[in-house]
Amino acid sequence: MKILVLNGSPKRKKSDTMHITRAFLDGMKEAAPQEVHIVDIIDKHIEYCTSCFACKRNGGKCIHNDDMKALLDEVLESNLLLFSYPLYCYGMPASLKAFADRTMPLSSMAMKKQGGRYVHVGQADFSHLKYMMICGCGFPNSKQNFEPAVMQFKLMFPNNHTIITVPESPMFNVPEAAEVTVRDWHSSSRLESSMLRQAK
């Protein structure tokens, strides 16, 4: 399985949430071979979407000449797209939100009814993709913190998604918590890996 990890933390590999994500990925690798590529979004040149809709009229080509073209190509070549990020103002950090906004070339102007809402018709085939979100925050409570980020992810990826929210995530990144972090996250990720293989 090809896994593309989008690390939305400006702290890069020092991210508390990314520490949890790495433990989760290690567990998945124990369950089955995985090809993992971690991208620190903060280091990528990603211009803001200007909503010009050029990509909707020309078959998916964006007006910006930056790193998004290569990233979108890698997205479509992956099996699992994993968003790893700390909660910023009840949502994604700005650099990761810019990435999400720039996925516009994957869909056309045409719309279709899906369930109880309308969605854009795809310009690319991403039906094979599964999506995961691992989001951490420093607060001890999940309620009245993660709901906006969870709702956004569910609306963006209504099918084939897994959402993991972790309150007090900095606590998992201290040496004293290493054993618990490895044990618990390896166990849950082995189960997730098994479920993903069965869903193919």
Task: Give names to the regions the model predicted.
Residues 1-108, 174-175, 182-200:
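N-terminal beta1-alpha1-beta2 submodule of the flavodoxin-like/Rossmannoid cofactor-binding fold
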Residues 2, 45, 129-131, 162:
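A generic secondary-structure signal marking the coil-to-beta-strand transition
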Residues 40-42, 135, 167:
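Residues at the C-termini of beta-strands that transition into short coil/loop
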Residues 161-169:
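Beta-strand-loop-alpha "switch" segments that mediate conformational coupling across diverse proteins
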Residues 94, 142-148, 174-176:
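A short secondary-structure junction signal
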